[in-house]
UniProtKB/Swiss-Prot annotation:
The name this protein goes by in its record: Phosphoglycerate transport system sensor protein PgtB
Bilayer-crossing regions: 20-40, 342-362
Reactions accelerated catalytically: ATP + protein L-histidine = ADP + protein N-phospho-L-histidine
Compartment(s) of residence: Cell inner membrane
Molecular function GO labels: ATP binding; phosphorelay sensor kinase activity
Origin superkingdom: Bacteria
The organism's taxonomic lineage, starting at the top: Bacteria, Pseudomonadati, Pseudomonadota, Gammaproteobacteria, Enterobacterales
């Protein structure tokens, strides 16, 4: 089964195999992507819940709790406010905190906002009740303070009056004792009067004791009110106690009706009893105090209940958010575990697929064959067209190998054809060069032939003079005139040197130039002079003149070729001028090149032939082959120079030659 599967895999083409591997990888990637996307979606949901709901709720809850704590602290200060101004300021601050809590509740859920709104409304109502209870308590305390001050004032008046009476009683008794001692006869009368004073004093002391009991009871009741240890039952007991004291006081007061000095004391006791017993005074004050204290206590209990509802709501909200967050976390952990397992399985399958693809397909079917094919291509690239391509098969690599073998066969055939064509072209080029060389040599011989008459004349004159000098030298020797003979022979030697220079110049010009002759420094001005001397017959008959610069320049080239070019150019210039030919030569350096301008005073270039003057067999002369300029162009190219045609400002013909400048050091 495994071998059959491997065989089926080997029969698949590379594209189908790669397509199958790509589809499998894409399927695994799709599975991993879907699982990852689902996990990402769940994580994103939890993050959105955390950012949009959980953290805002927690933040709002903490802010609400913070403002609630501030409100509680200020409420405690509100309960202990020393005056109405401070209480009103604290009430305003508490209301502001409640309003802020209401604004912060917008971050909670709807049900929680509704519950919190009810609690806030109850809190505002409770705050109003507390404020009312505190206000009533403040009024009652003011009234209690007034009663306490009134009792103290009456007690002080009673004490002052009592002290005055006691002093008066003491004075009366002292006076009576003095009178008894002074008037023994009226002693009984004075003793009776002394007993009456003592009886009055005793009644006054009884009133003082009753007054002290009344004051102590009133003060005790008021202190009990202030300490919060009183209730409605004690008020009734207080009234009954004062009624008993009033009965006792009335009995004593009736006994004092005969003593007008005690009227003030009796009135003070009546006022104290009125304070303690009249309904709209101390009894109502005590009842109002107890009621206000009870209302304040009830409001405080309601405050604790409201705060408990606040905290219960906040704890429930925090607990609900925390529970929901835990549920999200547990669900996300489960999803992460499942998705992680799926991703792990898909990763293992992808690794298994990659290993199988690499082991059974890439290494065996692709890498080895690609390597062999690459080595064959490298050998072909190195020029080894006889290399073999050892790759076969029916897949893409096999087809590429077959195409490459076919292409290699065609390349070999084309290479052989190209080699044959190159050999033929080399033969043709050699023939062309030989023919060009023959043409150059023919042109040289034509120039020599044209100058033979001048050369014969130039050589004939020195020969005639030489014959005469030799005859003169012989006669001088016969006559023994050795000095004259020596001078004559010296002149003859100069003529021989002149003839030798003419012959050498002619031989130098007619020497065949070798194509492979290396370039060397050439004195361009001297070469111009030599070429001009070769054309002496022509320029003398036309009264020609050659103008050369005075400076010496050295160029890179071959003297024979340069002389041939100059002879062709100067001959054309002389032919263009019928008489009085003037040929002006100038040169200038352009970087590493020397440009030579050769201009004549002839009619200029023929416009009709100007585009083809540098082509072979193009001439405006009646007699001539028209190959001089084309040969000159070829010779300049061989010396890495150039020849161009131009015109002067006066429309005379001008030939521009370009040479490479040679250093003086190279010349030396």
């Amino acid at each position: 089964m495994k071998g059959r599967l491997l065989q089926r895999l080997r029969q698949l083409s590379i594209s189908n195999s790669l397509r199958g591997a790509f589809l499998t990888g894409a399927l695994l990637t799709l599975i991993v992507s879907m699982v990852s996307l689902y996990s990402w979606h769940e994580q994103s949901s939890q993050v959105r819940y955390s950012l949009d709901e959980y953290f805002p709720r927690i933040h709002s809850a903490f802010l609400i709790e913070g403002n609630l704590n501030l409100a509680v602290d200020q409420l405690n200060e509100f309960l202990l406010a020393p005056n109405t101004t401070v209480r009103l300021q604290l009430r305003t601050q508490i209301i502001q905190h409640l309003d802020k809590i209401e604004r912060l509740s917008q971050g909670l859920q709807l049900a929680e906002r509704r519950q919190l709104a009810v609690i806030l409304q109850d809190s505002r109502t409770l705050l109003a009740e507390l404020d009312n209870a505190l206000y009533n308590m403040f009024l009652v305390r003011e009234k209690v303070s007034e009663l306490s001050a009134r009792i103290d004032w009456l007690h002080d008046d009673f004490t002052t009056e009592l002290n005055s009476l006691v002093q008066d009683f003491t004075w009366q008794q002292g006076t009576l004792l003095d009178q008894i001692e002074a008037n023994q006869g009226d002693a009984a009368q004075y003793l009776q009067r002394s007993r009456e004073v003592q009886n009055e004093q005793q009644q006054v002391y009884t009133l003082a004791r009753i007054e002290n009991q009344i004051v102590d009871d009133l003060r005790d009741r008021l202190n009990e009110l202030k300490s919060g240890n009183n209730d409605g039952m004690l008020v009734e007991t207080h009234i009954r106690y004062l009624e008993n004291l009033k009965k006792t006081a009335d009995e004593n007061i009736r006994a004092l009706d005969d003593w007008p000095s005690t009227i003030t004391l009796r009135q003070t006791i009546d006022e104290l009893l009125e304070i303690g017993m009249v309904k709209n005074k101390m009894p109502d004050t005590m009842r109002d105090y107890v009621a206000a204290q009870k209302a304040l206590l009830d409001a405080s209990r309601a405050r604790e209940a409201t705060l408990g509802r606040f905290r219960t709501l906040l704890e429930a909200q925090l607990g609900s958010s925390h529970q929901q967050m835990q549920t999200f976390n547990q669900r996300l952990e489960q999803i992460v575990r499942v998705s992680g397992g799926l991703i792990l399985v898909a990763t293992l399958l992808a690794l298994l697929l990659a290993w199988g693809l690499n082991h059974y397909f890439i290494r065996s079917r692709l890498v080895k064959r690609f390597t062999a094919l690459n080595q064959a291509v490298v050998q072909i690239g190195l020029g080894r067209t006889d290399s073999t391509i050892p790759v076969y098969g029916r897949d893409e690599l096999g087809r590429i190998a077959r195409l490459l073998r076919h292409t290699l066969g065609q390349l070999n055939m084309q290479r052989r054809q190209l080699e044959q064509e190159v050999a033929e072209r080399k033969e043709i080029e050699a023939d062309l060069r030989a023919m060009q060389d023959e043409l150059i040599q023919t042109a040289k011989l034509a120039v020599v032939g044209q100058t033979m008459t001048t050369l014969a004349h130039e050589i004939n004159q020195p020969l005639n003079a030489l014959s005469m000098y030799l005859f003169t030298a012989g006669r001088a020797i016969e006559q023994g005139q050795s000095g004259q003979a020596r001078n004559t022979l010296t002149k003859a030697e100069g003529l021989i040197n002149r003839i030798d220079a003419i012959i050498r110049s002619l031989r130098q010009f007619t020497r065949r130039a070798e194509l492979e002759t290396p370039l060397y420094p050439v004195d361009l001005r001297q070469t111009f002079v030599a070429a001009w001397e070769l054309l002496a017959m022509r320029h003398q008959s036309r009264q020609g003149a050659l103008s050369l610069p005075t400076d010496t320049v050295w160029v890179s080239g071959d003297e024979v070729r340069i002389q041939q070019v100059l002879v062709n150019v100067l001959a054309n210039a002389l032919d263009a001028c019928s008489h009085d030919a003037v040929i002006a030569v100038t040169w200038q350096t352009q970087g590493e090149a020397l440009e030579v301008y050769i201009a004549d005073n002839g009619p200029g270039w023929p416009v009709a032939l100007l585009p083809s003057l540098l082509k072979p067999f193009t001439t405006s002369k009646a007699v001539g082959l028209g190959i001089g300029l084309s040969i000159s162009v070829s010779l300049m190219a061989q010396m890495k120079g150039d020849l161009r045609l131009a015109s002067t400002l006066t429309r005379n013909a001008c030939v521009v030659l370009q040479f490479s400048v040679t250093d003086v050091d190279d010349v030396e």
